[in-house]
Amino acid sequence: MMVCGLGLAIQSCNDGKTYAELKEEERDAIQRFIELNEIKVIDEEQFEAQDSTTNVSANEYVLFDESGIYMQVIERGNGEALEDGRHEMLVRYLEKQIGEDGTTDTLSLNTIPNMFAHPDEFILTKQENSLSASFAASGAMYQAHSSTYVPSGWLLPLNYLRVGREISGRSKIKLILPHSQG
């Protein structure tokens, strides 16, 4: 009786897609999104040669090969590069999911001032090249995901931005994140 039950459980697990197949579908969906939106992908070497900026008018995004993150720097900011230590960060965001056909659906946002008077806040700790952060348990990201976890894909850009407090000097980016980074 026990062997039969185990056999049925193993057999039923084969009906779904493997993790590798799901990752491949995600890569394909991201590629379709890039094609649909006529995004020009540059490598990290070119990004660094351009002083860690992207050409927004050419719709450039840099691909960070190790993480699979794509980033477009719209406004780098006029603050300073982050020093080691603890930093209070304020963020407004629009989170979308890329579907199999490369189109998007909005999942979460805090960009509408009359709905979200305050940006989300997270506390960032930087120690040498290591970044970690957690959201305050009161913002839109916490409400959407019931977690204070700041996605690792949100941290990578902080190595290239000049974060400041003035609205006129804000940093603004667009990211395309694989599920493992977002």
Region annotations inferred by a language model:
Residues 13-182:
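Cross-family detector of peptidyl-prolyl cis-trans isomerase
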Residues 8-12:
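C-terminal motif of bacterial Sec signal peptides marking the signal peptidase cleavage site
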